[in-house]
């Protein structure tokens, strides 16, 4: 049986070994005009995490990138420090060997904003790794994480004009509920 790139891709914990390929992915997002997916050009944009701000320039420093990795990993703990509007989340990175391909995040609960706009799961595949099944494989893997954590049903949203993401969500069993504020909203029952 022929293996596809999505068969080789793995969901892994964020790790400093992805430093260079992570930065290259940020550059790809910027070059594609997708700064909202570049992730950390100025994160968090609303400056709501006192003492925590990552930029493309600051992440050139391996120590700062390790700080980012550590910060992301701490956000899995519901007791970790975060602004009131944020919820605990688990972020996994899509990788092939030491090559960063993208990320997928699972928010452990929904607040009002996430219920309308963000959903439980969000993902981004770097432009150079698209159209290879990575988003579908990552979503399938994260749905298993939802199952283990007892998150059911799962809300996933995408922009109304994001046809590839719509197909990915529907392919994972998403049932369309409605459109709110420019977002298609889908539920997956586990």
For every predicted segment, state its role.
Residues 1-120, 145, 179-190:
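GNAT-family acyltransferases
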Residues 30-34, 129, 150:
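Secondary-structure transition/hinge residues
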């Amino acid at each position: 049986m022929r293996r596809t790139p999505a068969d080789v891709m793995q969901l892994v914990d964020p790790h400093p070994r992805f430093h260079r390929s992570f930065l290259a992915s940020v550059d790809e997002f910027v070059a594609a005009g997708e700064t909202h997916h570049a992730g950390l050009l100025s994160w968090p944009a609303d400056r709501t995490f006192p003492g925590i701000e990552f930029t493309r320039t600051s992440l050139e420093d391996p120590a700062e990138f390790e700080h980012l990795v550590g910060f992301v990993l701490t956000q899995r703990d519901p007791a970790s420090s975060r602004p009131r509007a944020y919820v605990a989340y688990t972020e996994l990175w899509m990788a092939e060997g030491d090559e960063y391909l993208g990320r997928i995040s699972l928010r452990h609960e929904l607040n009002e904003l996430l219920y309308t706009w963000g959903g439980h799961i969000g993902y981004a595949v770097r432009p150079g790794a698209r159209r290879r099944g990575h988003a579908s494989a990552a979503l399938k893997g994260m749905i298993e994480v939802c199952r283990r954590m007892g998150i059911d049903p799962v809300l996933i949203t995408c922009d109304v004009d994001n046809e590839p993401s719509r197909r990915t969500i529907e392919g994972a069993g998403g049932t369309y509920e409605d459109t709110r504020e420019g977002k298609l909203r889908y539920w997956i029952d586990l």
